Structures are given as C-alpha cells and as structure tokens.
C-alpha cells in the first residue's frame, strides 16, 4: 500500500504542474460544440495505471491506446522522413524506485518494440536513472519535475545520443515565404518570472520563434539542427533557461543548434501536429522524441478532448465509455 501511495503522490505532483503550466502556451482556443458536450459529460481523466488496473475492460482500452500510440508514432516517422530528418525515440521519466507505476513497467517494452518494428533507433533512458533517488533528480517533495542536478544527469544521458548522430543532415529547405512566424507553441519573446503556483520561481525565456531557447534561428542554417519534441520533461518547468538540459547540451555541442520545442502536457498527437504545422520549418536534421509510458494512456478519449493541441473532437468507443462508467459511475 505504501508503494502505491508513493506512486500516486509522485504522479500527482508531476501532473499538477503540467495542468497549471498549460496556460502559458499559445494553443488555439476554438470552441467545438460536440467536444464541449463530451467534456461536460465525461469530465474525468484516468491515468494509465488506473486504466491498467480496471480488469478486462481496462486492458481492452489500454490495448486500444497502444494501437493509437503505434499509429501516431508511425505518422511522426513519416513526417520526419518527408523532410529528410532522422527520428530517434527516447524514453525518459522521473519515475524511479517506489514511484514507478504499473503503466511505466508495462509501457517501456511496448514503446521499445514499437519503435524497433518501425525501424526507429530507440533508447530507454529510464534504466540509468534507476540508480538515483527522486530527491536527487527532481524537485520532490514539492514537484516531480527535474531539479537542477537532475537536469545535468539528463543532459549526460542525451550527450552520447546526439554525439552518435553528428553526421546526420537533411537537405530540405524552405523559403522565407513558406516559413511560419513561429516553430514552437510557446509565446515568442518571453522573459518572465514564473513559479507555477508552487513557490518554485524560475525564469522562462523564449526566442522570437516560440522555442524555449534564447537565440533565434537564422537561415540558411550553418550548423546541424537537433529538435527535441515532448512534454514537460523537455520544457523543464521550475528551472531557469540556463539550467534546462537542452541548454546544457547546447553548451556541450557548440557546432549544433539544440532546439527545445517542449510544451507541458503535450502528447505524441501534439508533437506530430507541431512538427507538421510549424517545427519542420526550422529545418531539423535530427528529431528526438522524448516520450514516456504514461503517453500511452493519453490516447484515452477524455484526455484527448481535454488537452489535445488540435482541439479536435474525439468520439469515444463503446469500450471507452464502459471503462469510464466502471471508473467514475454511470452517465445518463
């Protein structure tokens, strides 16, 4: 029981910050009537572990979410291939020790196998993190995101991944007329002090193109460009720009431009949409997806309707509704 409580506590601290910080991004606020009705009727969002623990119905829904994850990873691969960029999958999570959830244990091998099946290079970076405690690498007990020390450790994990891809290049270019004003979904030109409502102050700096970095990208490019896509693990709340792991990597690779396109709460769906609509115009040579097993559960319909970047309407299957009723009660 103690292990379960620790896991739930860690997950809550990690995702409470995610929900708060979502408001600091520029995401469309278009209202869709059908989607609004679904949000009103089905307001609860179960995490992946709750889905897995819901018996046969939960397993059926989790299998559905896994298929959606696999399909979306394939879509991301195709988008990367279309611009001549190499896509690498990395699994990264601050869940370690007693905080490791059932979804993490089951999700890691699935993601690795799915990536391999698509012919993608993949790295499980959770294994080397297992030697640390949550207090060593995160802001626990206040928050479950990376601490300054944890950010250094994460940067060290990504250093060999980027070094091994030193010669990777893409010849795809775009004209000034084709490029959008921003390549990321954060508000551009920010230099603001935030605390996420947790009294953990940090300075957020974004460039003129909506990425969490201080310098703007110029064209034509003269260096290899590495684009990191992901959620809060990439964005790194509660750390100043100089402390986040992408900035530390930039210091280690001065002949490479490291681009942080992370947005708190973003899913694999969102990352694919961001690449297609904006980020590809930054002309990346290497794209690193930062994912974790909880991203699988993000393909449940209530999560997608509530948080999806696209603001599309995701109509639930009968099995998804059955799970919702099982977890949260009947909806008339």
Feature roles, as predicted:
Residues 225-229, 259, 287:
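Conserved beta-strand elements of the Class I
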Residues 19-113, 125-136, 212, 243, ...:
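Serine-dependent acyl-ester chemistry module
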Residues 4-12:
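Sec-dependent N-terminal signal peptides
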Residues 273-282:
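Short, well-structured alpha-helical segments in soluble
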Residues 24, 29-56, 69-70, 74-77, ...:
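Membrane/wall-proximal cationic-aromatic binding patches
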Residues 14-17:
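C-terminal motif of bacterial Sec signal peptides marking the signal peptidase cleavage site
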Residues 147-149:
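Accessory beta->alpha helical hairpin/"wing" motif in late/C-terminal subdomains of nucleic-acid enzymes
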Residues 260-267:
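Short beta->alpha junction loops
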């Amino acid at each position: 029981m103690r292990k379960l409580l620790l896991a739930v506590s860690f997950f809550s601290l990690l995702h409470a910050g995610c929900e708060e910080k979502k408001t600091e991004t520029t995401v469309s606020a278009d209202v869709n009537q059908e989607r609004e009705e679904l949000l009103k009727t089905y307001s609860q969002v179960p995490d992946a572990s709750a889905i897995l623990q819901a018996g046969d119905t939960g397993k059926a829904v989790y299998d559905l979410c896994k298929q959606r994850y696999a399909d979306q990873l394939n879509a991301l691969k195709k988008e990367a291939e279309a611009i001549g960029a190499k896509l690498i999958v990395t699994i990264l999570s601050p869940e370690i020790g007693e905080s490791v959830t059932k979804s993490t244990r089951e999700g890691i091998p699935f993601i690795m196998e799915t990536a391999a099946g698509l012919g993608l290079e993949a790295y499980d970076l959770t294994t080397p993190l297992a030697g640390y405690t949550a207090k060593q690498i995160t802001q626990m007990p206040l928050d479950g995101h990376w601490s300054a020390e944890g950010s250094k450790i994460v940067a060290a994990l990504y250093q060999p991944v980027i070094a091994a891809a030193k010669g990777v290049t893409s010849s795809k270019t775009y004209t000034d007329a084709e490029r959008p004003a921003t390549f990321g979904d954060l508000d551009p030109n920010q230099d603001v002090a935030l605390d996420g409502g947790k009294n953990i102050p940090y300075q957020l700096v974004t460039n003129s193109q909506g990425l969490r970095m201080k310098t703007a990208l110029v064209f034509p490019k003269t260096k290899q460009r590495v684009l990191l896509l992901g959620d809060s693990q990439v964005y790194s709340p509660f750390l100043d720009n100089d402390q986040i792991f992408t900035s530390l990597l930039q210091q280690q690779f001065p002949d490479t431009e490291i681009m942080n396109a992370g947005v708190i709460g973003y899913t694999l769906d969102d990352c694919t949409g961001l690449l297609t609509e904006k980020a590809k115009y930054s002309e990346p040579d290497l794209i690193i997806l930062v994912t974790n097993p909880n991203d699988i559960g993000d393909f449940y319909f209530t999560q997608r309707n509530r948080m999806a970047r696209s603001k599309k309407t995701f109509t639930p299957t009968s099995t998804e509704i059955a799970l919702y009723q099982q977890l949260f009660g009947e909806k008339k």
